[in-house]
């Protein structure tokens, strides 16, 4: 099971997450309590292992700005949490992830229209897009096609206590956590370690 730790804001957390086995790290460039500057993101990314995906999170940002930040920071993928359509996705010409809030099985069917490398299924949007720490009904994704499952990233209220059930129900390609590995709003490296251990155990 692949694991993404999202909302990275400092070098120490990034390095420890990689040591514990994270397959991807997320850097939020949209409005969020976990927002990071491109300059700091670049510093961190330059120190990370080559095999770890470096994913930039954007919400309704212009194609030009996304491309510039991607190139300057050394991102491998972009994660789109806004109203981006296939036209914008094609213009980006960058490996991409489309994030969708899930309220019914219709959302799963709509996801298949997006021409992205991955689809991230999350809890419905609130003030901030993603990272709200709220789970949705995983059963809504239990019967997706094999093709969609192989490009599914599951997010939304995941933590070390519920990750086994989430993986067993959805069987995604990757799981994504942010607030579920925090203590008082800050990344907690021990929680990151336990989350990664639990998630990896599920795929043995």
From Swiss-Prot:
Pathway: Amino-acid biosynthesis; L-tryptophan biosynthesis; L-tryptophan from chorismate: step 3/5. Pfam families: PRAI (PF00697). It comes from the Bacteria. The keyword Transport does not apply. It catalyses: N-(5-phospho-beta-D-ribosyl)anthranilate = 1-(2-carboxyphenylamino)-1-deoxy-D-ribulose 5-phosphate. Keywords: Amino-acid biosynthesis, Aromatic amino acid biosynthesis, Isomerase, Tryptophan biosynthesis. CDD domains: PRAI. Its EC number is 5.3.1.24. GO terms for biological process: L-tryptophan biosynthetic process. GO terms for molecular function: phosphoribosylanthranilate isomerase activity. InterPro entries: Aldolase_TIM, PRAI_dom, RibuloseP-bd_barrel, TrpF_fam. Belongs to the TrpF family. NCBIfam families: PRK01222.1-3, PRK01222.1-4. This is N-(5'-phosphoribosyl)anthranilate isomerase. The lineage of its organism: Bacteria, Bacillati, Bacillota, Bacilli, Bacillales. The gene is trpF.
């Amino acid at each position: 099971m692949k694991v993404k730790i999202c909302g990275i804001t400092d070098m120490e957390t990034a390095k420890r997450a990689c040591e514990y086995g994270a397959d991807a790290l997320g850097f939020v460039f949209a409005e969020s309590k976990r927002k990071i500057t491109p300059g700091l993101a670049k510093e961190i990314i330059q120190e990370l292992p080559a095999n770890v995906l470096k994913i930039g999170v954007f919400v309704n940002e212009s194609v030009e700005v996304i491309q510039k930040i991607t190139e300057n920071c050394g991102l491998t993928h972009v994660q789109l949490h806004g109203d981006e359509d296939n036209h914008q996705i094609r213009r980006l010409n960058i490996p991409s992830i489309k994030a969708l809030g899930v309220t019914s099985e219709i959302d799963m069917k709509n996801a298949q229209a997006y021409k992205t490398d991955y689809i991230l299924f999350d809890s419905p949007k609130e003030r901030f897009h993603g990272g709200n720490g709220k789970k949705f009904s995983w059963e809504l994704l239990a019967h997706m096609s094999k093709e969609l499952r192989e490009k599914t990233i599951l997010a939304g209220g995941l933590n070390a206590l519920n990750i086994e059930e989430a993986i067993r129900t959805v069987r995604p390609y990757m799981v994504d956590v942010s607030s579920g590995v925090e203590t008082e709003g800050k990344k907690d490296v021990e929680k990151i370690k336990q989350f990664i251990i639990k998630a990896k155990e599920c795929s043995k």
